[in-house]
Every structure is written in structure tokens, then in C-alpha cells.
């Protein structure tokens, strides 16, 4: 059967699961680099070009079944894999683990499975129990597609389901965005505004918080240990305006869990001058207002960070400096 016929058959079989594309989750800082580069790169290429800021997976092993995973771009078939529970969101107490502080979802066209160099792992590619198929026909027949798309509440000790949910498609080296990227999904309006402030308007940008875990994530006790769900806070939305020589900002958080984080509001002028406000939150509100006197005759950018991770990117109309750094 030709690759196209195999694809049509696979698409028909997976219709019951609502298969809508190939999913690549990454941190916002990586997303900016991907958009500016115009391509999704393998880990090796991204590191070589100094474009990889945060990694969703920091395991040392990069070789599986003789395949150097760092030489491939990697995609999931369904959203919210178990891997995301370990890495999504700004963690109140970071311990050097895998981290995706501000998650962004890039959705690529399904037809990429027809790439003649594609590799199909029936689970997490770095799991020693996963098997790799080098052709679409075999993957279509042998992979546990029901398990891949299952999103029922998972028993932490169910290693099989955890592995299979993370089934991956691997494509070598790089995948161009042009003609292949079909959607960019953000968790919040704040993330969408940040993206537009940096790379401009894009009709592919959308918001769908159901594609993320939002508050829900696991601590690092390990599968089968005494795990609990954490609350990872972030900015939901913000509005910034200027009245005379005063900058006014209204912003809201996803949770009132604020005191566990270090907060920094910062204005940076084109000359390099900065104004910093290290705010302490002792209330339980999620919506806040801030006013700051500014030097109005000089271009400036505004940032807001928690635990050192920037959650607001805003620029005055006359700003001509770099964006997204």
C-alpha cells in the first residue's frame, strides 16, 4: 500500500480519537527562537545554534534502539502527555529538574507521518520498553492507538499507560514551519499578547487552556512514590497603559499562591537604565494594579518575572531594540 493510502487509512482509524495533528510542546523562550528561525530543529541543532533555553526532558540518555534522539525533532500524537506533568509551569521550588516554565504548543500537519525517514516509537522514545518502527504501515498495525489517545485519570503505578501516552513520531534534523505548522496554542491571553508583542500578529495563534495541565502537575517524588498535585502559578492576563508620566498595569494570576514565588517588575530603557520593583505579595487576591513613574521621552520595555521566569513582555511604541530576550 502506498504511503498516501496508509495515511488515509490511519487517519480514518484515528478519527474516533479526534486526532488533529502532531504536537510539539516547548517553553515560550524556545518558541520565540523557533518562530524567528522559521524551523523546528532537533535538540542537537538547537544546542549548536544556541537556540535551546529550556528542555522539557533533561534525561542524559539520548540513544534508543540505536537511534540518536538528539538528531531528531519529536512529536506527540495527542496533547497533555504524562511527560508534561513533570515539566509544565513555573515551579515554586526549582531543583534543577526538567522544566517548561511557560508552555506553548506547536501543532504540525498530520501528513508528516508520511515522511520516508520518519520513526515511530510506540511509547516514550527514551523508555527502554518502547519499540521503534521505521515505516508507517507497521506502526499503524502494531501501535496501541487506544492507549496513545487515552486521557483518563492515570494510576501513578501504571507504567504501561504512562509510557504509551507518550508515543512519539521522530523526524530527522529540522522541520520547516512554512507549510507544516497549522496552529500555535497558548495557555493564556497573557502568553498570546507576549507572542504578538515579540513576533507580531499571526493567524495561527490561538488560546486553548484545555491543551495544558494548567494548575495540575506532579511533584518529583517519582512514579509510585508519594506524589501530589502542585499549583504552578502564572499570569493570566495583563493590560498596560500610559497616563502622562505614569505607567499603569493591571494584571491577574491563575492562583492566589503568590508568596511562594519571588516577583520582579522591571522597566528597561533604551539607554540601559532600569527601574526594578521586587514586590512582596501578602494578600490572597489574583488581580492586582501597579503604577510606576517613567521617563516618557525614552523608549522602554516592561517585564514581569516570577522566580526569574519572564511572564510579561511589553514594549513602548517607540521601542526599536531587540524583543523576546
Task: Kindly give the residue locations of the regions a language model identified.
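Active-site-proximal loop/hinge segments that shape catalytic or ion-binding/gating pockets
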Residues: 1-74, 79-325
Amino acid at each position: 500500500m502506498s504511503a498516501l493510502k496508509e495515511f488515509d487509512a490511519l487517519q480514518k482509524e484515528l478519527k474516533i480519537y479526534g486526532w488533529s495533528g502532531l504536537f510539539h510542546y516547548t517553553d515560550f523562550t524556545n518558541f520565540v527562537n523557533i518562530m524567528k528561525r522559521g524551523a523546528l530543529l532537533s535538540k542537537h541543532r538547537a544546542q549548536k545554534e544556541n537556540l535551546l533555553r529550556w528542555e522539557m526532558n533533561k534525561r542524559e540518555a539520548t540513544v534508543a534502539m540505536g537511534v540518536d534522539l538528539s538528531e531528531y525533532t519529536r512529536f506527540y500524537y495527542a496533547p497533555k502527555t504524562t511527560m508534561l506533568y513533570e515539566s509544565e509551569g513555573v515551579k515554586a521550588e526549582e531543583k534543577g529538574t526538567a522544566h517548561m516554565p511557560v508552555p506553548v504548543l506547536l501543532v504540525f500537519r498530520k501528513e508528516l507521518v508520511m515522511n520516508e525517514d520518519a520513526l515511530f516509537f510506540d511509547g516514550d522514545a527514551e523508555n527502554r520498553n518502547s519499540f521503534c518502527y521505521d515505516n508507517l504501515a507497521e506502526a499503524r498495525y502494531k501501535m496501541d492507538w487506544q492507549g496513545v489517545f487515552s486521557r483518563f485519570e492515570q494510576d501513578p503505578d501504571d507504567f504501561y499507560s504512562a509510557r504509551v501516552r507518550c508515543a512519539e513520531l521522530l523526524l530527522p534534523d529540522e522541520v520547516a514551519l512554512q507549510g507544516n505548522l497549522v496552529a500555535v496554542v497558548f495557555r493564556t491571553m497573557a502568553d498570546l499578547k507576549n507572542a504578538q508583542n515579540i513576533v507580531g500578529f499571526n493567524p495561527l495563534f490561538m488560546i486553548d487552556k484545555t491543551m495544558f495541565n494548567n494548575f495540575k502537575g506532579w511533584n518529583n517524588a517519582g512514579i509510585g512514590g508519594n506524589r501530589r498535585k502542585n499549583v504552578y502559578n502564572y499570569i493570566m492576563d495583563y493590560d498596560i497603559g500610559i497616563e502622562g508620566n505614569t505607567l499603569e498595569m493591571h494584571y491577574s494570576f491563575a492562583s492566589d499562591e503568590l508568596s511562594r514565588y519571588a516577583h520582579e517588575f522591571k522597566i528597561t530603557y533604551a539607554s540601559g537604565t532600569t527601574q526594578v520593583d521586587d514586590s512582596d505579595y501578602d494578600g490572597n487576591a489574583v488581580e492586582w494594579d501597579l503604577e510606576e513613574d517613567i521617563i516618557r521621552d525614552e523608549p522602554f520595555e516592561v517585564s514581569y518575572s516570577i522566580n526569574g521566569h519572564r511572564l510579561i513582555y511589553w514594549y513602548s511604541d517607540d521601542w526599536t531594540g531587540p524583543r523576546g530576550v
